[in-house]
């Protein structure tokens, strides 16, 4: 159990800042400055959670002291029994709350509350890899549905035998990036492909990248330097062909502030038949691409301090194997194995994400000075 005074001192030191932020977010001048306002409202939520925890912590300590006093001075059996029960309950809750407070005091990834861009690409394995990429997309789509999140596809390149060579979509909702970020990496599948005539098990792979979606003020883009092209998009022929140029392609020269190297970014968006909507989505992906490159330095800095593979941001790392003959899924980062593959592929992935979250929280606690 942590030192009560140490925890209270840390919490008491945040009271003045909480009161200051509470006042600032009602200031019209602050509300007019959207970048500052968004930052302060996030800080307010974090501090509000800490203030609620502080109130409960102080109440538990008071309950214990009051119960001790009753047990020392009261002779009535019923009163003593009630006091003993109150003290036991408070002493049981206290260490649990202390761990919760420690986590609240350790800085979380500032991007956790953001929406996300989800990118899935078929890797080694040809047609089977594309089919598996499609399976992963459906898995995430069903998971997002259970979370009440909104998923919108911005571009898709279908595989010849089904699935996707590449599919990119945006996911909006509460704490999307903080939940899905653990899915970044290489997902490996072992199964008998539908095209396999000998019944042999093949190994294929698909890569998943989860990027925090950038907001307009997260990155600076000179929109006057963007080169736009439009083109027709749609199906292979007949009535599915889009007869107007609704597809958009943008090119933008960007200098990476971390390396000093300039690179050309090329983004296409063909998902809707509305050119302005496609331009809006392409621009959002451009912002996210640039923001992700800059955010990667933050992830690398965190990873260098930790031995865990849970959240290193290394998208080339093999993170999970899906073994169909055995109905088994293994997450290699935490040596976690489950045998409910059918349910997992149907979107039931929260338990695995919870285990990964616990593992990362343990690493965060090691960094805490408490």
UniProtKB/Swiss-Prot annotation:
Belongs to the prokaryotic/mitochondrial release factor family. This is Peptide chain release factor 1. The keyword Cytoplasm applies. The gene is prfA. Its main location: cytoplasm. SUPFAM superfamilies: Release factor. InterPro entries: PCRF, Pep_chain_release_fac_I, Pep_chain_release_fac_I_sf, Prokaryotic/Mito_RF, RF-1. The modification N5-methylglutamine is found at residue 239. Peptide chain release factor 1 directs the termination of translation in response to the peptide chain termination codons UAG and UAA. It comes from the Bacteria. It is found in: Cytoplasm. PROSITE patterns: RF_PROK_I. One of its GO terms (molecular function) is translation release factor activity, codon specific.
């Amino acid at each position: 159990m942590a030192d009560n005074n140490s925890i209270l001192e840390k919490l008491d030191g945040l009271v003045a800042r909480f009161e200051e932020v509470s006042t600032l977010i009602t200031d019209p001048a602050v509300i007019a400055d959207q970048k500052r306002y968004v930052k302060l409202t996030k800080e307010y939520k974090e501090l509000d959670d800490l203030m609620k925890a502080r109130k409960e912590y102080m109440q538990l300590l008071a309950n214990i002291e009051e119960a001790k006093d009753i047990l020392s001075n009261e002779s009535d059996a019923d009163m003593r029994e009630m006091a003993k029960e109150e003290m036991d309950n408070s002493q049981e809750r206290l260490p649990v709350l202390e761990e919760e407070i420690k986590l609240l005091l350790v800085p979380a990834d500032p991007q956790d509350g953001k929406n996300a861009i989800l990118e899935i690409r078929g890797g080694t394995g040809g047609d089977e890899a594309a089919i598996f990429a499609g399976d992963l997309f459906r898995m995430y789509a069903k998971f997002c549905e259970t979370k009440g999140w909104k998923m919108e596809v911005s571009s898709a390149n279908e595989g010849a035998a089904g699935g996707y060579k590449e599919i990119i979509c945006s996911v909006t909702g509460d704490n999307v990036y903080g939940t899905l970020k653990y899915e970044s990496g290489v997902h490996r599948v072992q199964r008998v492909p539908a095209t396999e005539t000998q019944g042999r098990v093949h190994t294929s792979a698909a890569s998943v990248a989860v990027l925090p979606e950038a907001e307009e003020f997260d990155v600076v883009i000179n929109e006057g330097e963007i080169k736009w092209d439009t083109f027709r998009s749609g199906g292979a022929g007949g009535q599915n062909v889009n007869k107007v140029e609704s597809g958009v392609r943008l090119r933008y020269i960007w200098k990476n502030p971390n390396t000093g190297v300039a690179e050309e970014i090329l983004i296409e968006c063909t998902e809707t038949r509305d050119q302005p909507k496609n331009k809006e989505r392409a621009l959002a992906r451009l912002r996210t691409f640039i923001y992700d490159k800059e955010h990667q330095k933050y992830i690398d800095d965190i990873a260098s301090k930790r031995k865990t593979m849970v959240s290193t941001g290394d998208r080339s790392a093999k993170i999970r194997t899906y073994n169909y003959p055995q109905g088994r899924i293994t997450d290699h980062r935490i040596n976690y194995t489950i045998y409910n593959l059918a349910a997992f592929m149907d979107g039931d992935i929260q338990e695995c994400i919870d285990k990964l979250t616990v593992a990362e929280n343990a690493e965060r606690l090691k960094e805490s000075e408490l």
